[in-house]
């Protein structure tokens, strides 16, 4: 049987705090910022939890994380 491989792109983009808690950055803050208001850009700075539905579908991509 093949080894399970960890997706390196996911390891770089997300922080794993526990089995059911994964942190991610908000999308939409890398370019085209002139037309976005400062209030909107401030809200995009947040680090938020990944939804439970997404966590269950991503478990196989990072098999060796707690």
From Swiss-Prot:
GO terms for molecular function: structural constituent of ribosome. It comes from the Eukaryota. Gene3D superfamilies: 4.10.410.60. The keyword Ligase does not apply. Belongs to the bacterial ribosomal protein bL35 family. PANTHER family: 54S RIBOSOMAL PROTEIN BL35M, LARGE RIBOSOMAL SUBUNIT PROTEIN BL35M. This is Large ribosomal subunit protein bL35c. It comes from Gracilaria tenuistipitata var. liui. The lineage of its organism: Eukaryota, Rhodophyta, Florideophyceae, Rhodymeniophycidae, Gracilariales. The gene is rpl35.
